[in-house]
Amino acid sequence: EKNDHIGGLSTFISDLPSKTRMKDFPKYLEARAARLKNLYIFLNTEATVDKIKQFKPDIIVNSTGSVPLVPPIKGLKENIDAGNVNTIFGMINNVNAGKYPEEACQGKKVVVVGGGSVGLDVIEYFAPRGAECTIIDMLPQIGMLADPITKCSMRETHDKYGVKEYVNTALQEVK
């Protein structure tokens, strides 16, 4: 693990008020790992080819975690985390800095690009705070790859707060 802790994106996402239950996940992983006599966790360690070769593994599993994809959309990279265009990391940093209190969200238009788990988490934050939310995805269904429980709660949230959904839709440009 190249970071000083395990848990990956879940430790960051757990800063969202509706996701605080995830804060215990890294502790759970550590407790499980501690019971396994044949598992070693190296923190603050980059998984280089030379480092992996030192272990002489029979099997290698690439479990590199989740990093938000920044697709090659005109104007996107230039505007990320500058102003009103955020990755999930920028959005959570703004939440933690107090930039999105409930009164600031009322009536704001929020467009989420990507209907996967992270996009659904963003909607779950803004919709109950009175934002006018829209979610778009290139797939034919929002939350298409989500588990059944997430799909059920997503549908409930989207219906309750009037979240607009656009499927088979791709963002072309950010201005």
Which residues does each predicted region cover?
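N-terminal Rossmann-fold NAD(P) dinucleotide-binding loop
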Residues: 119-120
